[in-house]
């Protein structure tokens, strides 16, 4: 983990405001390391500048409160929602993810590219690209 920290990947203003303990279990910490090592750090190196994590790991309670799906990969430490500041720049980042052919399970252009959801899991990554 060169450019990201576990603390950064678990930070949540919502959890802090509501007093929710968003501490990940060991299995989620391991998955976060995999996500960073295989996707986020290589992407940051290629991008050449900071990438902000809006949301990484979410405990079940936090995931429910923010409207996450019941089977969200965020709950396992396999996903992060990222941005580089604007939809225009995020579209460039999305194009870079595709060009690098990073081992993503899902890469989702969220809400007009306001942020990008990226996930990685141990084993087979489906390389699914979607828009929501």
Residue ranges and their predicted role:
Residues 1-44, 131-132:
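Extracytoplasmic cell-surface/polysaccharide-interacting catalytic and binding patches
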Residues 12, 21-23, 60, 65, ...:
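Surface-exposed loop/turn and secondary-structure junction residues enriched for glycine/proline
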Residues 37-67:
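Extended, low-complexity, intrinsically disordered C-terminal regulatory tails
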Residues 71, 75-76, 80, 84-132:
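Catalytic cores and adjacent binding grooves of peptidoglycan-active enzymes
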């Amino acid at each position: 983990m060169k450019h990201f920290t576990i603390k950064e990947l678990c930070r949540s203003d919502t959890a802090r405001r509501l007093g929710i303990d968003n501490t990940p279990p060991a299995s989620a910490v391991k998955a976060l390391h995999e996500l960073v090592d295989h996707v986020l750090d290589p992407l940051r190196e290629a991008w050449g500048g900071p990438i902000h994590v809006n949301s990484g790991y979410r405990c079940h309670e936090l995931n429910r409160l923010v409207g996450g799906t019941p089977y969200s990969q965020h709950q396992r430490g396999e996903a992060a929602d990222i941005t580089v500041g604007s939809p225009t720049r995020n579209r460039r980042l999305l194009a870079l993810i595709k060009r690098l052919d990073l081992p993503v399970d899902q890469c989702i252009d969220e809400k007009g590219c306001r942020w990008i959801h990226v996930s990685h899991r141990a084993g087979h990554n489906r390389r699914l690209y979607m828009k929501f």
